[in-house]
């Protein structure tokens, strides 16, 4: 009798093992996160596969995430010399005084390299640096014409990427009612920009101290520019890319991180605060890496 019971136990245990049910843990489903932002999107940067969407194709104000395209246009210039010097004009200073946006605190009369301007553009989100770059790389005899030309290049770049829901009317995100994109499109702009090694280096830098040349030829050590993207410090594997904010845009963030050879890149638009946009991005990236 005992032998029969033992045999039955062995048979039953074997059947359970074969079926994979003994001690098995049910697979945990990955739950799509809830975010505070009005719109969001993320994709696998290597494959282009969509990982997350929330109103991903709705046009919204982009704030300073616009500067991703500003940098992309500059870096696409033929025969670009990153060490070329740009003299800071009073108009750039007057612009930030009048609009009170984020700035790199560039000094009128100083000579600043294009490379330094890119750091001033992307780390502290300097609208003065954006103006200087637009003035440098636009075409025309007057600053207004050059700026208009540069914005035209930004729109041409968007068109070339097939982004029909994106339009720029400013070089820095301080729009005049026609500066918009979508979470999906901003992600694609960032993905394209990240193909450039200089761009990648700039946007993953946490802090940068520029040494500029003054009107008298002396060297000025600027106050250190700190990256406004807090994820570079708080999220393992973060590699960029750009924050944005404004009365209409609210709180925006284009983000990217690499883990285990997989890069998740995405955007949140119109979140409720700086901590909220970083939390939104963290949730989306965790979700993207778990898929």
Swiss-Prot record:
Reaction(s) catalysed by this chain's protein: Preferential cleavage: (Ac)2-L-Lys-D-Ala-|-D-Ala. Also transpeptidation of peptidyl-alanyl moieties that are N-acyl substituents of D-alanine
Pathway annotation: Cell wall biogenesis; peptidoglycan biosynthesis
Location in the cell: Secreted
UniProt KW keywords: Carboxypeptidase, Cell shape, Cell wall biogenesis/degradation, Hydrolase, Peptidoglycan synthesis, Protease, Secreted, Signal
- Read off the Pfam families from this record: Peptidase_S11
Recorded superkingdom: Bacteria
Please give the name of this protein.
Answer: D-alanyl-D-alanine carboxypeptidase
Q: Which organism is it from?
A: Streptomyces sp. (strain K15)
């Amino acid at each position: 009798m005992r032998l029969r019971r033992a045999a039955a136990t062995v048979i039953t245990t074997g059947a359970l093992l074969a079926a994979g049910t003994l001690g098995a843990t049910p697979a945990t489903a990955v739950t799509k996160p809830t975010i505070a932002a009005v719109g969001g999107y993320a994709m696998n940067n290597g494959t282009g596969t969509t990982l997350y969407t929330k109103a991903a194709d709705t046009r919204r104000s982009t704030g300073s995430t616009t500067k991703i395209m500003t940098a992309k246009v500059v870096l696409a210039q033929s025969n670009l010399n990153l060490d070329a010097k740009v003299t800071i004009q009073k108009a750039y200073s007057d612009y930030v005084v009048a609009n009170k946006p984020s700035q790199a605190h560039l000094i009128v009369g100083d000579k600043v390299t294009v490379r330094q301007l890119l750091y001033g553009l992307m780390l502290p989100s300097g609208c003065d640096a954006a103006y200087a770059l637009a003035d440098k790389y636009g075409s025309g005899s007057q600053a207004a014409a050059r700026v208009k030309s540069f914005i035209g290049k930004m729109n041409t770049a968007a068109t070339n990427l097939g982004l029909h829901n994106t339009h720029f009317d400013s070089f820095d995100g301080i729009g005049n009612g026609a500066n918009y994109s979508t979470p999906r499109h901003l992600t694609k702009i960032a993905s394209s920009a990240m193909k450039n090694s200089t761009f990648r280096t700039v946007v993953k830098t946490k802090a940068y101290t520029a040494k500029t040349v003054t009107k008298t030829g002396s060297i000025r050590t600027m106050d250190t520019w700190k990256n406004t993207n807090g994820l570079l410090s708080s999220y393992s594997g973060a590699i960029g890319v750009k924050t944005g904010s404004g009365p209409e845009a609210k709180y925006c963030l284009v983000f990217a991180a690499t883990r285990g050879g997989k890069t998740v890149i995405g955007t949140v638009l119109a979140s409720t605060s700086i901590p909220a946009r970083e939390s939104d991005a963290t949730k989306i990236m965790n979700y993207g890496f778990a898929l």
